[in-house]
Amino acid sequence: MTRCLDQIKLTLLFALIALALILRAQPSPAAGTETLTVAGGCFWCVEADFESVPGVIEAVSGYTGGTTPNPTYSQVTSGGTGHYEAVQITFDPARVSRETLLNLFFRSVDPTDAGGQFCDRGDSYRTAIFVSDTGEKALAERSKAEAQRALGQAIVTPVLSLGAFYPAEAYHQDYYKGKKLVFTRFGPKRQLNAYKAYRKACGRDARVRQLWGNAAPFAGS
């Protein structure tokens, strides 16, 4: 009997440790703010797009949707973790609504592509919206249906339950405005210039403009 009780206590201890790790991985939003977590291909681009939106406080690049705890960029892009490259957006709902952000999201990606985004192929680059409750799910599904009607094509972006969100390595945060010198296939460049060269070469904005036309919020001209 004592051995059984000890085993139960040990099992409960492991369960509590696992729960603590999951909660630790979730950034705590500031009072009066909300979060929206989306996957839209390269997280550098999604982060850059949404940090330009008035009412967005910050956007953090990271990984979610998979089973591997505390994954690295190399693990995620190599496959097998189940994680998406994702961005967690913290926003002030008094300044910008969740619905507005969802509408911007759909019009900033190719939601018809089930195999990745633009030049980035593979499961980790697929699109997705992650939700925490039934209200968020209903709103995301409604936004998806509206975007599908507007586009006139089937949208394959799933609406998934949000699990642990793991912030990506510091190197990836705010990459689009970084000043460090990096070596790329375009030669040595500052991060912000390497980002611009990558985004153009990947064809992100060209494809989004092709799909959404003037409704594309971040694609420029």
How should these model regions be labeled?
Residues 2-5, 13, 21-221:
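Flexible coil/turn and secondary-structure edge motifs
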